[in-house]
Amino acid sequence: FDMPDMTEESFAEHRAAECSSLSVHHNSYLLAAFLLAYRYKKNPVYLEIGRRGLETLMAAYPETELEHSETQEKCRLVFPLAALYDATKDEKHREMLYRVVADLEKVKHPSGGYYEWDTEYRAKYSRVSSTECSLLTENGDPVADLLYSVNWLPIGFAYAYYATGDEWFRQLWKDIVGFC
């Protein structure tokens, strides 16, 4: 979306278009914003955009486009998926949220942080250092990215707790804020 130049016509075009980018990095929080707008304005168009976009990303998950690491993309999905479940209360959306967090938990460090991980090192910036690059050198290195990854988790886990009422998310929130 080119928000500064958004008109009713261009908004309708974007709404009708198929999702052409499977980038969690670039799409997930915009989709969450539509879901929050739906929560407050009750405009079903906002729900449709957020739902369709996140369902498209999750249909490709875990093979979405990666920027820096798998960890980063999973961290960026928690809040949007919690917002989706909060908006719909659909069990399949709840399952999406739990799936991503369960996958993320596989790289949790006892300190409460999350290792950067990139199976097959396929992220866009995994082995490139000409502009910016991942902090990850090798999977298993004791490094957590506080700029691109775990910084998304406090709000994600807090909202997941709000949306689900599950104490597990409250504990995850406590763990990550203790780490940060």
Question: Model segments located where?
Answer:
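Glycan-recognition and catalytic cores of secretory/periplasmic carbohydrate-active enzymes
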Residues: 1-180
